[in-house]
C-alpha cells in the first residue's frame, strides 16, 4: 500500500480517515472510539471528529481520548450547533486519507479486522469505490433489537449500482468505507 501526499499541503496523509460526528453521545462515545482504536491494521489512520455543540459530557470525553491519542484523534468541538449535515461535511473536508470510513458517535464496530478487511477488498478490487457490511441495531444494553435491515427490494449481498447507493444511502452511511473523492 502506498501513502500519498495530500494535495492541499506537503504533509504525508494517512491511509484511511474515520469520520465520527457527535451530538450528546456521552453514553456511547467511549465505546465508539474504543471500537476504532481496537482495529488491527497495518496502515495509518486518523479519526476526524465533529462535535456539534453537545450539552452533555461528549466534548470532555473526546478531549480525554484526544490527549491519549493526539496523533490519531483530530476533533472539532463546536460552540454553535450547525446540524449533522454541515458537521459531517466539514469533517470530510479535513480528511487526508485515501479512504474514508464513517461511524456516528452512538455506533460502534465489533470486528477488530473490519477496516483491514474492507481496505484489502478495495485495494484488490480497483473497479469498486465503496464497500459495506452487515450491522445490527442494539439497545443501550447491547441487546440486539434487529439484525441487518435491507428493506424491500434491496439486495442483501452483491454489487450495488449508483441507484442502490442513492436509494439506500443510510445503510451505506453507517457501515461503509469509501475511496476519498476529496483528494
Across the structure, where does each feature detected by a protein language model lie?
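Acidic helix N-cap motif at the loop->helix transition within catalytic regions
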Residues: 28-30, 56-64, 86
Amino acid at each position: 500500500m502506498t501513502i500519498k501526499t495530500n494535495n492541499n499541503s506537503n504533509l504525508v496523509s494517512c491511509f484511511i480517515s474515520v469520520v465520527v460526528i457527535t451530538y450528546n453521545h456521552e453514553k456511547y462515545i467511549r465505546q465508539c472510539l474504543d471500537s476504532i482504536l481496537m482495529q488491527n491494521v497495518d496502515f495509518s489512520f486518523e479519526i476526524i471528529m465533529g462535535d456539534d455543540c453537545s450539552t452533555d459530557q461528549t466534548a470532555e470525553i473526546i478531549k480525554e481520548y484526544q490527549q491519549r491519542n493526539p496523533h490519531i484523534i483530530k476533533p472539532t468541538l463546536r460552540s454553535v450547533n450547525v446540524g449533522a449535515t454541515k458537521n459531517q461535511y466539514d469533517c470530510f473536508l479535513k480528511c487526508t486519507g485515501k479512504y474514508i470510513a464513517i461511524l456516528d458517535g452512538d455506533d460502534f464496530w465489533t470486528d477488530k479486522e473490519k477496516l483491514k478487511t474492507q481496505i484489502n477488498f478495495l485495494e484488490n478490487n480497483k473497479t469498486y469505490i465503496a464497500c459495506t457490511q452487515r450491522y445490527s441495531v442494539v439497545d443501550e444494553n447491547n441487546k440486539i433489537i434487529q439484525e441487518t435491515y435491507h428493506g424491500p427490494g434491496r439486495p442483501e449481498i452483491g454489487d450495488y449500482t449508483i441507484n442502490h447507493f442513492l436509494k439506500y444511502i443510510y445503510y451505506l452511511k453507517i457501515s461503509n468505507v469509501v475511496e476519498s473523492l476529496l483528494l
